[in-house]
Amino acid sequence: MNENQMKRIHTGKGFIAALDQSGGSTPKALLEYGIKENSYSNEDEMFGLVHEMRKRIIKSPAFTLEYILGAILFEDTMYRTIDNQYTPDYLWKEKNIVPFLKVDKGLTEIENGVQLMKPISNLDDLLKHAVEKNIFGTKMRSVIKEANAKGIKMLVNQQFEIGKQIVEAGLVPIIEPEVDIHSTDKEESEKLLKLEILEQLSKLDKETKVMLKLSIPTQDNFYIDLIDDPHVVRVVALSGGYSQAEAKERLGRNHGLIASFSRALSQGLTAQQTEEEFNGTISKSIKEIYEASIK
């Protein structure tokens, strides 16, 4: 593990950029970027176009270590290059931004009020490749729809079981049990979730380190004891469907919680913009998300 990267993620000022739209969400991301579905005829072309979008974001002069601590990449991006370097190497060597990899394969159907992760059949191989490509950590998402104690326990157990496998491979897992922001009992779900996470953290070996990616809590500063836990490198927040303005406003009220936004980061960016327009738009977004993250 790279100690410089660990120090940067643990104590640095800034946020984590989520650039990990997967195959399922890529058409929507491209559409928002101004590229219609008839612009590509197969998955390869689609991933090629989305890599160009990500490359444009990463290479932007606004995308700097001053504001951004890390970036979460989709598996396909890990194997692609920017200026003849693999994307993770470009991020760290050229930008001093720590690379993470999304490892989950999507969600199961809702059961017991939650959506667990689908089995990650190639996890060992994927982690091996991630280490070879100088990835620092991983991210995997599951979703809580209802305050169902049984479901939430199962979901957190699954996250930590896989998390331990990731730690053994020499990487830092971002554990992401998202609470659906539209859930009618969101606050109750958050209470159950925090209890389960605290229980799992208490069972970890002293040297085991994890990160958490959580929905912005209903009650401000509700996750402060997770932020202060010695096993937790950092707690980051997802925007979860809030608009950029609302996500930033809510985040700013939670001390020690930093952003890991994707939609809120790329909002307003289009393929048709000139470099000046593109860089101006993303610069404004980055600075505003950063300001909310350091409160």
Swiss-Prot record:
Reaction catalysis annotation: beta-D-fructose 1,6-bisphosphate = D-glyceraldehyde 3-phosphate + dihydroxyacetone phosphate
Keyword Lyase: yes
Signal peptide: none
GO BP terms, alphabetized: glycolytic process
Enzyme Commission code: 4.1.2.13
Pfam families on file: Glycolytic (PF00274)
Name of the featured protein: Fructose-bisphosphate aldolase class 1
Provenance organism: Clostridium beijerinckii (strain ATCC 51743 / NCIMB 8052) (Clostridium acetobutylicum)
